[in-house]
Amino acid sequence: MGAVKRKRGFLLPPPPLFIFLIIVVFSERSSLVVSALNYTRYRTVGSLRLARIQRHLDKLNKPAALTIESPDGDIIDCVYKRKQPALDHPLLKNHKIQKAPPEMPKKRKMKDQEDGLGESNYDRSSSNNSSERGGGAWQIWHQNRRRCPKGTVPIRRIKVHDVLRAKSLFDFGKKQRSSLPLSRRVDAPDVVSGNGHEHAIAYTGASEEVYGARATINVWDPAIETVNEFSLSQIWVLSGSFDGSDLNSIEAGWQVSPELYGDSRPRLFTYWTSDSYQATGCYNLLCAGFVQTNSRIAIGAAISPVSSIGSSQFDITILIWKDPKLGNWWMGFGDNTLVGYWPAELFTHLADRATMVEWGGEVVNSRAGGRHTSTQMGSGHFAEEGFGKASYFRNLEIVDGDNSLSSVREISTLAENSNCYDIKSSFNDPWGTHFYYGGPGNNPRCP
């Protein structure tokens, strides 16, 4: 652009207060860009939008009894249980928090450990051996040895630049409606084809009566090509119509999502919806709904350590099941830790039971219709490469009407684009029903 001519005249020096405001605004802008680790796409943000964002953050970030700084930059607020975001939900105004479900799945009991996970859930010495057993994964914020006090729950603090990475304030913390299918066969699983979401999953029949599911999931840190793509490995517990607007879904696992978290670390996550991802539900604790009860596990916090090729393998065990007496859907982590629950009031179809369970991986390919993304699923290696290279789900189980855990013997598998990501299932004694899955995305067979 050319220079702009100005009229001659005398210019008065700006008042000191004006200079101070300019410095503050510039400092805020600089800190936003740097702290987001280049994942926040800076753009001009109006004062009204910033005010709306701040009001939203004030609702999510409750006053903390104690604040813990994680080595990875996260801030963990220890919030009193009765002050957590879940209880802001209009259906939960008079909700009484359960400490533990009155009845556990019968195969293996769990217990509420306010002091954390058992030693069996974290084995630093675990390695690739003949028995193919993985070691449990922990969370990075535990490394500084500080813990939330009893009576509080750890909640990852949300910052302004976390919201700025989303398309809008409404979209923040939610799955995009564009990921929903317009039509689906009656017996098809909850997958999305042709719009950028790709899967490699195992699933049960659509007509089964299911009251929960469990699996142990290998943890990796797959590479993500662009900020608006993600890679996750999770369990889906589903009920309702796949073709309508009443699908109920409860989900949990690990996820790498630069847009949601601002980095490329694998993180423990949850999700729920009661209306096919339209208006209800969210990731983690980014809206009212999920009630956390444990003081050691922070949903949305980074998992550590992670697996590496041909070396130590680490995994997490996720259990989701319905309390047969009160109807709440509980989440267990590891062998013996209750994390919290989704109250029955949140759901329609899941207030009764689930009709399908899925286990597996999902990625977003933002280049749909063009060159395929190089975003990896699982470890970034194909299923046939096996233990130590390919990612796995092992010991797939479901909870039946008697509140008993049993191994899943009959599953179907699906990979929409097996040249990019695939899946291979099997069965043996130590791992029960299990499968390897994943892939590198873009490669000579997946251009």
Question: Where are the predicted features?
Answer:
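Exposed, interaction-prone regions of secreted/extracellular proteins
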Residues: 2-447
